[in-house]
């Protein structure tokens, strides 16, 4: 978790209350700041694909909007700390691909409109939440994140399912690769693993150098750089109203802030 104010000062890491951040800790931290002028970026998918098949989990739930999906996932997940690994495991081969025993992987490769648009326009290779295997998979974090959003609701609006509020906090979906590309980091080299590389990326965001850290991890540098990127782009109207995002897409699948 990294946070910054307006201006140029580099984002700072926020110390967790108990050694490492849990989802529950993040949930409580956000509830305490719901009335603050805060733009919050989460790096996970806020919804599963809906429009291609008119269902999130065909044959299982009749949910037609992300909030109904979040509630369904939460109701059918018993994992600690808002986890969702069991939700995926009990549905492997039916909705999720976790390995060769689940069948032909291509049959699970359904994408949201936002991911299709991002991939088709050279942004990279955004993953689908139905693919739950490999280092690039986003399924486990995304369905766990949906549980977090369910418990956060209705304290903080979630864009673009909700319009941006006139005051108070707002949550958006982010993709750290977008921030890395904006900082001039080439494809395949998105991770920053030392202070010098982080400062070069921050400079591209109009930010001052960061305070040195005892150790550099992908999670820490991603959080710092993406917080700076959000600050730089928070007032860009084209990112709040991307031409490819229709009202139907926003209502059923959401969108990633930064995909234009």
PLM features: what roles do these ranges have?
Residues 1-39, 44-260:
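RNase H-like (RuvC/DEDD) metal-dependent nuclease/polynucleotide-processing core
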């Amino acid at each position: 978790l990294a946070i910054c104010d307006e201006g140029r000062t580099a984002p700072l890491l926020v110390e967790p209350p108990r050694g490492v951040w849990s989802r529950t800790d993040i949930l409580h931290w956000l509830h305490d700041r719901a009335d603050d002028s805060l733009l919050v970026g989460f790096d996970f998918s806020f919804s599963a694909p809906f429009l291609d098949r008119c269902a999130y989990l065909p044959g299982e739930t009749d949910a037609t909007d992300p909030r109904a999906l979040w509630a369904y996932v939460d109701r059918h997940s018993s994992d600690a700390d808002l986890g969702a690994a069991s939700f995926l495991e009990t549905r492997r081969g039916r909705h999720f691909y976790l390995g060769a025993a689940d069948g032909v992987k291509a049959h699970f490769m359904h994408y949201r409109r936002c991911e299709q648009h991002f991939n088709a326009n050279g942004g990279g290779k955004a993953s689908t939440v139905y693919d739950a295997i490999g280092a690039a998979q986003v399924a486990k974090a995304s369905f766990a994140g949906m549980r977090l959003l369910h418990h956060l609701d209705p304290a903080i609006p979630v864009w673009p399912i909700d319009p941006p509020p006139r005051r108070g906090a707002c949550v958006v979906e982010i993709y750290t690769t977008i921030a890395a590309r904006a900082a001039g980091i080439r494809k395949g080299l998105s991770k920053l693993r030392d202070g010098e590389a982080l400062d070069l990326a921050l400079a591209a965001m109009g930010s001052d150098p960061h305070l040195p850290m005892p150790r550099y991890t992908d999670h820490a540098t991603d959080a710092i750089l993406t917080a700076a990127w959000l600050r730089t782009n928070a007032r860009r109207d084209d990112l709040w109203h991307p031409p490819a995002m229709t009202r139907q897409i926003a209502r059923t699948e959401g969108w990633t802030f930064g995909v234009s």
